[in-house]
């Protein structure tokens, strides 16, 4: 049943009220903390004798000690064992991982309703409930938080002390790397492969790339994990083609996980933050990995576009296909098609219904058409 405008406004008001309550509590805590600090500072100011050089020297030493302690404390606070992810506060990735999944979906629903408010009012329609992973907003019961759904993982590399190779995520708002032992939203094993690449590069004295000095070799690594096939493809991005102990390095990377079917090397010697360069070559295994969506099998090359969350991709594609309302003889153009996933899935769906259509795929990157 379509939700009325009044009902939508009422629900949005409840959401805003709940969020406002949380902000108010946070504001009160912050104010209380500031008041306490202010009283403490006044007390210290009274205790200090005017004109005492000794007190000033001691205060300077104390500030220096506290400054060092604060830096150490700040580094420790970056790791929160109670969070779903121990490095969530410092990592530049997830921002809502510690919120209950139902609240995440509710926030998305409110955002979509606000975005399409004028259209819905003009056309007399409503935004459908958000369809999450394994649950639709409004369903009764629990909303289990999804984990391990990102089937593409990547890392930058940076030089550490004494030839160390550092990897992980960029700290929020910086280019400082935060080490990542594991990531709860990535496919199982993906982060272990990336960390293993850093260890093997360090063992074989392959230097990490320094983006400030533009020196070094190993820049990035990308791991793509199949959803239905359980195959894994690794792409190593280097500043130049030639590497010390290259073959040994490639074979060591391939041995990190028995699921790895392809190791590719991409050469990117250009300055800047773009991950991939124009040249890619296969250095181990097959030229492509394989995965399946909606019953269609796809060959995926190292530089081809492929959706990161296959489970939601199937849901998204099926919604789009159902909305196409295809008929016999229709021509379907899949623009910027990458591997052609949505177009080919639409053709297969039409064939199941006995409908014959023509598919045209348009893609600029030849490697995308595996």
Language model region names:
Residues 2, 71, 82-88:
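N-terminal cysteine/histidine-rich coordination modules
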Residues 215-228:
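Short edge beta-strands and adjacent turn/loop segments
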Residues 158, 223, 230-239, 297-301:
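Short, aliphatic-rich beta-strand segments
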Residues 78-81, 89-208, 228, 243:
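Extended interfacial segments that mediate partner engagement and assembly in macromolecular machines
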Residues 3-30, 35-38, 42-75, 244-370:
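Rossmann-like S-adenosyl-L-methionine
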Residues 198, 202-205, 222, 321-325:
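Generic structural signal for well-ordered alpha-helical scaffold segments
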Residues 151, 230-232, 329-330:
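Nucleotide donor/acceptor-binding cores
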Residues 148-171, 223-225, 281-282, 287-293, ...:
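Short beta-strand elements
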